[in-house]
């Protein structure tokens, strides 16, 4: 009963020291589509499952992997509408930085500012936490970066990670397969294999999305390129 009294209050701690609404937001992430991020020696890859609930759905009308700036990409696990708002805000942050300083925003600066926005939604009245975790990848200072930001506003730098449904199995798989010597193509293969760990049904170029970032910038792979990668995996 004590927990129930605090479960609908965002700004009140429970007696055990928890913000229960944050735990609910993390539950939304844990039930969301699996997403994976892997740093390679010459780039970084992010990938996610993007299954459609109906064959009548217009494929590729809504993307889960999004470009934020020329050298930064983002993917999520959790609630799609919340993600759309964060994509919009992240792009605005990147553009404002460029207009102010006349140079592209560093990946770490973007992550910090997006995470600050997410944190503000954990201690403000009349709002709720974002029901998403983000993987933000990018390239600057001649090297790749990969960060994860959670509904609490906490963020971490990773070499490789998985989130969403079956995240524990995904991380276990990555711990066995990851190497800092991975080339970008090998990292894409590893990301696909990680998604396959908990994938139900047949994986095709239409039900996963992949983004890569290297010294040439960020791009979301088209279905034809993904199909080629899938063909090379037994």
Curated annotation (Swiss-Prot):
Indicate yes or no for the key word Nuclease. Answer: no
GO biological-process terms attached to the record: proteasome-mediated ubiquitin-dependent protein catabolic process
What Pfam families has UniProt attached to this entry? Proteasome, Proteasome_A_N
Q: Which UniProt keywords apply?
A: Cytoplasm, Nucleus, Proteasome
What are the cysteine partners in each disulfide bond?
A: none
Primary location class = cytoplasm
GO CC annotation, single: proteasome complex
- Which InterPro entries does the entry link to? Ntn_hydrolases_N, Proteasome_alpha, Proteasome_alpha-type, Proteasome_asu_N, Proteasome_sua/b
Q: Where in the cell is it found?
A: Cytoplasm; Nucleus
PANTHER family the UniProt entry points to: PROTEASOME SUBUNIT ALPHA/BETA
Protein family (similarity comment)? Belongs to the peptidase T1A family.
Q: Summarize the protein's role.
A: The proteasome is a multicatalytic proteinase complex which is characterized by its ability to cleave peptides with Arg, Phe, Tyr, Leu, and Glu adjacent to the leaving group at neutral or slightly basic pH. The proteasome has an ATP-dependent proteolytic activity.
Q: Quaternary form?
A: The 26S proteasome consists of a 20S proteasome core and two 19S regulatory subunits. The 20S proteasome core is composed of 28 subunits that are arranged in four stacked rings, resulting in a barrel-shaped structure. The two end rings are each formed by seven alpha subunits, and the two central rings are each formed by seven beta subunits. The catalytic chamber with the active sites is on the inside of the barrel. Interacts with Rpn6.
> What is the protein named?
Proteasome subunit alpha type-2
């Amino acid at each position: 009963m004590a927990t129930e009294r605090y479960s609908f209050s965002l700004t009140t701690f429970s007696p055990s020291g928890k913000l229960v609404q944050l735990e609910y937001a993390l539950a939304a992430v844990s039930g969301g589509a699996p997403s994976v991020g892997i740093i390679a020696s010459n780039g970084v890859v992010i990938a996610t499952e993007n299954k459609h609930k109906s064959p009548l759905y217009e494929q590729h009308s809504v993307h889960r992997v999004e470009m934020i700036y020329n050298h930064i990409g983002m993917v999520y696990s959790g609630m799609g509408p919340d993600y759309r708002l964060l994509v919009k805000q992240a792009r605005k942050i990147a553009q404002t930085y460029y207009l102010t300083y006349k140079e592209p925003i560093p990946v770490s600066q973007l992550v910090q500012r997006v995470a600050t926005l997410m944190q503000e939604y954990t201690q403000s009245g009349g709002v709720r936490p974002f029901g998403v975790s983000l993987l933000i990848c990018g390239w600057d200072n001649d090297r790749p970066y990969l960060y994860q930001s959670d509904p609490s506003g906490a963020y971490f730098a990773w070499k490789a990670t998985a989130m969403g449904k079956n995240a524990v199995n995904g991380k276990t798989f990555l711990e066995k397969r990851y190497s800092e010597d991975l080339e970008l193509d090998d990292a894409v293969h590893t990301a696909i294999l990680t998604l396959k760990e908990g994938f139900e049904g047949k994986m095709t170029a239409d039900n996963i999305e992949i983004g890569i970032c290297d010294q040439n910038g960020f791009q979301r792979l088209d279905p034809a390129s993904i199909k080629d990668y899938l063909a090379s995996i037994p």
